[in-house]
Amino acid sequence: SAQTAACRTETGIAYRDATGDGYVDSLCRLDICWPADRKGFPTVVWFHGGGLTGGRREIPKALCVKGFAVVGVDYRLAPRVKVADCVADAAAAAAWVVKNIASYGGDPRLIFIAGHSAGGYLTSMIGLDKRWMAPYGIDPDTAFAALIPYSGQVVTHFARRREMGIPDTQVVVDDMAPLNYIR
């Protein structure tokens, strides 16, 4: 369609430097779809759901044809890695967007972090707990226009509770719970 033709797409962009670890190098990638005929557009960084144990990056194309850039992010998955590694990957991807979106024509002041379910959890963690963006010199309070976590857990994620040998049904609020960082 004419609307879709106005979008450009680039896929498989590494947001972490190559490590030589095939798992890291294959999963720490993102796709970007952006308006080809505009500058200064807002950007949505989209983290997929899947319980932090499954899922693949995706781009909700409806946003791109409405004038947004959309960045679909893959991240490493539990139980192969710890939940903290999933969050660290989300932070690295968001930092890549902050540092690179202007080169695509996007407005770096209009970066929205969003995701569904596990992606909502990642959204909340990197946007509320400042330690995740700090290694990149980024303050989420000023770098992100908004956080949009759809159905994300605000207590400690069940995948983290599994790591700790705690039943999924037992609520835990520790340093990996977005609830601790709401301000």
Set out the residue ranges of the language-model regions:
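Extracytoplasmic/secreted proteins, especially bacterial periplasmic and envelope-associated proteins
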Residues: 29, 42, 65, 85, ...
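Short beta-strand element of the alpha/beta-hydrolase
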Residues: 40-49
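Short N-terminal helix/helix-N-cap motif within the alpha/beta-hydrolase-1
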Residues: 54-57, 80-81
